[in-house]
């Protein structure tokens, strides 16, 4: 078994080139060119259905007064969306960020969106006051559905217990 502590042993005979030159015409096995064709481009799925139009057109000016453009890059809570979500270049994202901040300072935009803040407020309070931190937060609709299913389960269990009590009394 070879271990790293053993030295590497060199062969005593030097490497020598073969005397016969290599020529392609003397090759014993030749492939026919008709059976195997090399395609210039490898097979790929077309990216056309996933191609999205850019969020900023060539004629759009990135300015704090252009509210229709700025509102596309702000979340429901009033936060500036990341570059990955926006699919913008670095330069465009920087200009959008500056325009949003300028619009906030000049009172064109609120710093927070208070209408949508109420949805997230109840969730954040439960996280702060909870006895243990939760890793995944529930979407309000799913939480409501989950709670209604739990209530139905509890009601069914109570009915079963009542039926057992009634049958045992007889």
Swiss-Prot record:
Primary localisation category: plastid
Sequence intervals crossing the membrane: none
Biased composition (Basic residues): 30-55
GO biological processes: translation
Pfam families per record: Ribosomal_S18
Subcellular location: Plastid, Chloroplast
Region annotation (7 X 7 AA tandem repeats) ranges: 4-52
Family: Belongs to the bacterial ribosomal protein bS18 family.
Quaternary data: Part of the 30S ribosomal subunit.
Protein name: Small ribosomal subunit protein bS18c
Organism expressing this protein natively: Secale cereale
